[in-house]
Amino acid sequence: MDEANQIAKDSVPRIDAYGFIRPVEFDYAVYEEFIARYRVVLTRRALKWSKLLQQSAAVEKSIKVKRYIRKGIPNEHRSHVWMVVSGAQAQMGMNTGYFRRMFIEGEKNPKLLDLVNTDLNRTFPDNVQFRKNSNPSLQKHLYNVLVAYGQHNTTVGYCQGMNFIAGYLILVTKDEEKAFWLMDALIGRILPDYYSPAMTGLKTDQEVLGDLVKKKLPAVSQLIEAHGVMWTLLVSRWFICLFIDILPVETVLRIWDCLFFEGSKVLFRVALTLIKQYQAFILEARNFPDICDKFKEITKGEFVTDCHYFMQKIFAEPGSLSKTTIDKLREKQRLQLASEEK
């Protein structure tokens, strides 16, 4: 470790604000430099958000709110804004007591309980708040949300990946019922069929990304095709975990700010920006394993640590990305998948 990194390590807490233990390879010097700049941004945004939320109907969908969300929601307002813009608040208001009923019913479902219990200790082992022996431990809250959601959405039930999403929602909302309704918004409406047994939505969007790369970054597309690498091997975790455990926590939360407001199109913007930023690095790959390694490497480093700069880039770098274009590509890929499964 160089001297600058050692000095920074002495001043930056080993455990972050969300309870995650910083990894061994964590670059303290880069982080310290970023956070000094970012605190200024956070202070400015917090003042603007406080003023906005004092107004009536402040979080209605508007150009102003969209601009504010893209620039980041302060942590103290994040839970409230996510609930309103995603429609989760309205659903919760219309379904008083529903979350509790689903949990009670779910507790009678041994298959669901087995699946949920299997993954509890695997959820964020690097987070002190999710450890079984922590006091308080978020594991019980995670269990309650996953059991209730599995009972609510019987088509999906429970599948791996959902535990990480529920965990992040609990960290942000600090409320089981809100986390449940935000999961309903994400899995039921924003990302339909990502977590269904056939995972049609997930498979479709991975191939749609392939189409977008072919159009916008043809050299990368040619390299991947030449080595017979399937997109699912490179990006399935990006999509299914919504960049959790892929990108830094604060960067993921900034992405989710936009995901709840603008929908799944944001995931394509993130993926395309990463690939475009590191295009030259990816093109150095000489074989199949090389390509896979490069795609793991591009999710680390200073570019993704500076979440504010990164978010500016995702709305600039990929260029135009209309809903019409994505809908057409999705339809094409759905038909392709259906024909392959016959």
UniProtKB/Swiss-Prot annotation:
State if Nucleotide-binding is listed as a keyword: no
Taxonomic superkingdom: Eukaryota
Q: Name one GO molecular function term.
A: small GTPase binding
* Rab-GAP TBC domain boundaries: 72-263
Keywords tagged on the record:
GTPase activation
Read off the InterPro entries from this record. Rab-GAP-TBC_dom, Rab-GAP_TBC_sf, Rab_GAP_TBC_domain
Q: What does this protein do?
A: May act as a GTPase-activating protein for Rab family protein(s).
Record-given protein name: Growth hormone-regulated TBC protein 1
Organism lineage string: Eukaryota, Metazoa, Chordata, Craniata, Vertebrata
Gene symbol of the encoding locus:
grtp1
